[in-house]
């Protein structure tokens, strides 16, 4: 329950979130200015909802989760932007990277899709395509790919979200099985076919075609 949280034990900066949905979080950057009543109203309303049904039943992984409140450390990047690397893995192998920057600043958010060799790919999600030839390759890219490879073992398709800090450390965000609940707009639409072509369903793709058994 929200009322069970001992805020005196939390640091000046922290994150509050619930475990059974996406985007249900509150960033607290100054506890002295924290609107506890507003946070309680939001969180208690989230706890009553089943995220699976909100998204048309597409996020089935949420359906049986017992709602909980989580307080986490507020991750900072030595005064710089916190880069978000969302690594799309298929059958335990990283294939596509979504790099997001300016996500937690007052600037406009930017996102880029790349392959694992850090070549930009000609598509985007929800926003028009933007290319940036000077997008710096992270020094710890191979380490992030290794982490994603390890965490994605045993899954047909999963997105592993990581943060890379200026000191070289890597922070785990989450694992996502249904990006944007499967209802996002790709630019161009042909990217849907490309992403779908990376999915291999054991026992289905290997099955003989009807009439050829």
Q: Where do the language-model regions lie?
A:
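A long amphipathic alpha-helix within ATP-dependent nucleotide-binding catalytic cores
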Residues: 59-69, 111-170
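Active-site nucleotide/adenylate-binding loops and adjacent lid/helix of ATP-dependent enzymes
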Residues: 1-81, 91
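Glycine-rich, pocket-lining loop/helix-strand segments that form or immediately flank
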Residues: 30-50, 107-130
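Short acidic-glycine loop/turn motifs at beta-strand connectors
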Residues: 30-31, 89-93, 165-168
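Beta-strand scaffold of nucleotide-dependent catalytic cores
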Residues: 84-100, 111-114, 171-176
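Short beta-strand-initiation
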Residues: 11, 82-84, 157-159
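Short, catalytically relevant binding-site loops at active-site mouths
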Residues: 76-78, 95, 102-106
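C-terminal active-site "lid" helix and adjoining low-complexity regulatory extension at the edge
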Residues: 146, 164-213
